[in-house]
């Protein structure tokens, strides 16, 4: 990396010899974009279990769960005819309290928690946490999270969202939302 020429490609070995000028220019553009891409703001991903802290925060705030609540995990649940597995498939985690369900990252427990919240409340929290748009960070190229409209009415969508699947967020938006929980 040359501080005086930040747009220069630092890994010239990746540029193959024998290319036409057009091919070389295209390859250089691709390498430059890869070199400067900020994945924390430019890319989105499904947060998976890293989202469970937000589901738990929503449920605690709304008094939908108590620390004394218990959950049974047989290794899967069926929602609207779709079988959703836990990370620990049958026989599952079995009987567990809230803290253990969180520690086990138990999908059926978090589906149960999400269903207690309901679609409208869950979606409103996603908006409040800033997960349906851009964070507004002062830089270019920030991507927006992607939340399907089906979260507003589909029990299956809610079940999947509760453990961080079927929607996309940027890493910076997820971190900002998680920081709001602390």
Identify the residue ranges that each predicted region occupies.
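Beta-lactam-recognizing serine transpeptidase/beta-lactamase-like catalytic domain environment
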Residues: 1-49, 54-182
């Amino acid at each position: 990396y040359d501080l005086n020429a930040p747009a220069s490609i630092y890994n010239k070995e990746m540029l193959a010899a024998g290319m036409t000028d057009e091919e070389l220019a295209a390859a250089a553009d691709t390498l430059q974009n890869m070199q400067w891409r900020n994945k924390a703001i430019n890319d989105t991903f499904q947060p998976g279990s890293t989202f469970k802290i937000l589901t738990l925060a929503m449920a605690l705030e709304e008094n939908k769960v108590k620390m004394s609540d218990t959950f049974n995990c047989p290794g899967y649940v069926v929602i609207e005819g779709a079988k959703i597995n836990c990370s620990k498939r049958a026989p599952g985690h079995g009987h567990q309290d809230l803290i253990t369900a969180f520690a086990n990252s138990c999908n059926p427990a978090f589906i149960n928690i999400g269903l207690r919240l309901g679609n409208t409340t869950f979606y409103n929290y996603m908006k409040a946490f800033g997960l349906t748009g851009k964070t507004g960070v002062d830089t270019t190229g920030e991507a927006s999270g992607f939340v399907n409209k089906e979260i507003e009415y589909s029990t299956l969508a809610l079940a999947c969202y509760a453990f961080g699947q079927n929607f996309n967020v940027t890493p910076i938006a997820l971190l900002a939302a998680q920081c709001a929980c602390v």
